[in-house]
């Protein structure tokens, strides 16, 4: 209840900007992708939608635009190192022939232990390879559910093991939530909290830059769902 005055104020500020936007802007739209399916808050669908948009080999026509916008937007945010972002951007700047980007939604890992095997599942696992250099981005998407006590810690361990096998910089770990709250688990200082409002802004800019792309209408409908 203590949060309602702040939420109301933020919503009021957002609505004041709407009259200055064109009527065709996604922020004005009442028709969206997920609400007809009663799936507005479905974490799996949002995760898969975001993974689709981040994957440059999918036929949406946005290439690496959204991924690059997210990396640039993280500059100056808590738990982010400038060198870390610059390393990722350098690899993204390579030509398509020089680099490989792998985006895997709902990636189930096999972890072998002394007495049992576990199968932790990361929401979005992104590997960027170019020559002898590699980078890793892990996105954990939480809309209504909270992370379990050791969930993020286990993902940190997966990222650490990946780094042992690839010459790379520090893995970029992103915690995506509606309000940008900090995770309650995981190692302090390792996860970057990103709110959906920031993501929506980057999606909108991507849409504005690619309105004639094959996936533009799909992106417009998804953006209206956020």
Per-range role (PLM):
Residues 1-226:
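Charged, terminal alpha-helix-loop-beta segments
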